[in-house]
Amino acid sequence: MWLQHLSLKTFRNYKETKIDFNPKLNVFLGRNAQGKTNMLEAIYFLALTRSHRTRTDKNLIHFDEEQLHLSGLVQKKTGSIPLEIELTQKGRVTKVNHLKQARLSDYVGHMNVVLFAPEDLQLIKGAPSIRRKFIDMELGQIKPIYLSDLTNYNHILKQRNTYLKSDQKIDETFLSVLDDQLVDYGCRVMNHRLDFIKKLESFGRKKHFELSNQIEELSISYQSSVNITDKQNLSESFKIALEKSRSRDLFKKNTGVGPHRDDISFYINGMDASFGSQGQHRSLVLSIKLAEIELMESITTESPILLLDDVMSELDNTRQLKLLETISQSIQTFITTTSLDHLQNLPENLSIFTIQDGKASVNGN
């Protein structure tokens, strides 16, 4: 798949911009704070209805406006798909083929993206919430039912936590009813995640072995607050975990076990990767990103769109060549950079957009 056209209206520092893209490689060139990353963020937001940089949607709206509008035309094997997002103070409206979508799971997945940014190193050494968000964003694109199950789980979780925080006397029977619902959707979420991690590890192991000159083996482990060793009895394991945690939950007034507490760990040759070197972290994250591309292709039969935010200057020549090798394989790619000197051995079929003060001009024109 590839993004043929993007229209931005009052998004970040872009007042109004319309831009046509190259189906292969697109480079956003400019000084810092001109809007290069904002352009990538717009593409990411159009795909996922979420920003990778802020949790507050109103930060995306141009400072002197009250709403924003993004639209794009995605080309896929099955044909063209127009996508639209309008964001106002009241919320967001999403459209596919000009038809309003009622649920997030009906919208996400029409345009798949893989983002690689310097902050992705936090995937290895950052907080568990960063890794959970990574799973949610990537898995949600290739399996829309996951977003539906996750939304339902979070809804029940919020209900349960609100009830635990209430001043009224706790009805343990009602709490058990909430627990049953939490177990139902929680097991669905965990099963989706376990399947995803297994496939990601399979693709990632091969990529990392190549990147490390056949000396490092990557493995990924899903760390759960629930006993996940027996998937057939996952529901029973979750119920037991909730029962054991009930006195703790009543005291702390929140839910202590479940997929909202889970994490993933990365290992290199059996050792915790978080203790590895900066170079190992870069290689590991690059391996994961390259694995994501292959995983998405294997499930959707479409290549995702690759977004590279100022990462080429962070990679040595070996890692750059490996990444460029992937780019050359019919994957639409967007790169931000302050200098073309950071980009070596680029393919010939590319478009360069100069970004200055929230305006984009192709090839400097």
From Swiss-Prot:
Whether NADP counts among this entry's keywords is no
User: Which GO terms fall under molecular function for this chain's record?
Assistant: ATP binding; single-stranded DNA binding
Provide the residue positions that the database annotates as binding ATP: G30, R31, N32, A33, Q34, G35, K36, T37
Pfam family example for this protein?
SMC_N
One Gene Ontology biological process: DNA replication
Q: Where in the cell is it found?
A: Cytoplasm
Query: Does the record bear Cell wall biogenesis/degradation in its keywords?
Result: no
This protein's GO cellular component annotations are: cytoplasm
Main location (coarse class): cytoplasm
- Annotated keywords: ATP-binding, Cytoplasm, DNA damage, DNA repair, DNA replication, DNA-binding, Nucleotide-binding, SOS response
SUPFAM superfamilies from the UniProt entry: P-loop containing nucleoside triphosphate hydrolases
Q: Which Gene3D superfamilies match?
A: P-loop containing nucleotide triphosphate hydrolases, RecF/RecN/SMC, N-terminal domain
Stated family:
Belongs to the RecF family.
Function according to Swiss-Prot or TrEMBL = The RecF protein is involved in DNA metabolism; it is required for DNA replication and normal SOS inducibility. RecF binds preferentially to single-stranded, linear DNA. It also seems to bind ATP.
Q: Can you name this protein?
A: DNA replication and repair protein RecF
Give me the gene this protein comes from: recF
